[in-house]
Amino acid sequence: MSFFVNRVWYGNHFLQWILVPFSWLYRIVIRTRRWYLQRFCQQLYPIPIIVVGNVTVGGVGKTPLVIEIAKKIQQKGLKVGIVSRGYKAAIKHFPYEVKLNDSAELVGDEPLMMARKINCPVVIAPKRNEAVRYLLDKHSVEIIISDDGLQHYKMGRSIEIVVIDGMRKLGNGFCLPAGPLREPDSRLKQVDFVIVNQGAAGGAYSMELIPKNIVRLSTQEEVSKDSFTSEVAAVAGIGNPQRFYSTLSQLGIKFNPYSYPDHHQFKPHDLNDIDLPVIMTEKDAVKCYSFSSDKLYYLPVEAKLNDSFWEAFWSHQQLQGYY
């Protein structure tokens, strides 16, 4: 898979041209699917549904943005809820409201991280409409945010926000399987907001992921980056680990990289044999609480967007009268 990602999707390998006919077929299928679901299957709701998604395969930094939007909504005095698919969640009955003492293996790493960082209900369900209805019935929320779900067209939405990785952009620009696009780049013209994570693009808003103090997993004690004067192990099980490694480099931390697949369920043996202090992402850290030790740390990040985005966001017609 890494060959496709690095050489074909984000490079100029000849194999992409062999796969282009399949990409055109894929475009026809997804266009037809979208038309059908929107016309015949989409469920609409009486409150704003904000979808934060992406048009590429892999991680782009959606979850920190979801957390920041939820916090901003709460600051307006509004009740917000979050729905998520719960990717790789072991639980089998849905919809399910994430509890703070749940394990990442049970409910998924991103839903658990969001539930622990925001004082609002987080509900998982592969069929997102079930999660939306649960929030409306059980919590009387005023605004719902969907973490991912841009292509889940059975769920109605009021605002669509697409996040793009500023390092990798849209790759070679082709749809699957020749490229990383879930939908053609023309889809960007139809959404309400395009946000570039750690970069810039014409007509898009820029987002920065600001690193906070490093935290020791076992005690939740904040530790200065200056404490790490010797080499550490940088562990990442995210869609684009290079972004995490670049952040550590910018902080002046020397490290050996240990990359795992996105959403990897860490076990003690993954980390026990590493003789160095381990710094991981916050998303990975929620999977390691049950076997935390003094050598495990994580680096939280916070999404930061400029005032122009928030002015445009709160001026959106779908949010009028909600604050």
Curated annotation (Swiss-Prot):
ATP binds at residues 56-63. Pathway: Glycolipid biosynthesis; lipid IV(A) biosynthesis; lipid IV(A) from (3R)-3-hydroxytetradecanoyl-[acyl-carrier-protein] and UDP-N-acetyl-alpha-D-glucosamine: step 6/6. GO terms for molecular function: ATP binding; tetraacyldisaccharide 4'-kinase activity. Keywords: ATP-binding, Kinase, Lipid A biosynthesis, Lipid biosynthesis, Lipid metabolism, Nucleotide-binding, Transferase. One of its GO terms (biological process) is lipopolysaccharide core region biosynthetic process. SUPFAM superfamilies: P-loop containing nucleoside triphosphate hydrolases. InterPro entries: LpxK, P-loop_NTPase. It comes from the Bacteria. Its EC number is 2.7.1.130. Pfam families: LpxK. One of its GO terms (cellular component) is plasma membrane. Belongs to the LpxK family. Transfers the gamma-phosphate of ATP to the 4'-position of a tetraacyldisaccharide 1-phosphate intermediate (termed DS-1-P) to form tetraacyldisaccharide 1,4'-bis-phosphate (lipid IVA). This is Tetraacyldisaccharide 4'-kinase. It comes from Legionella pneumophila (strain Lens). The gene is lpxK.
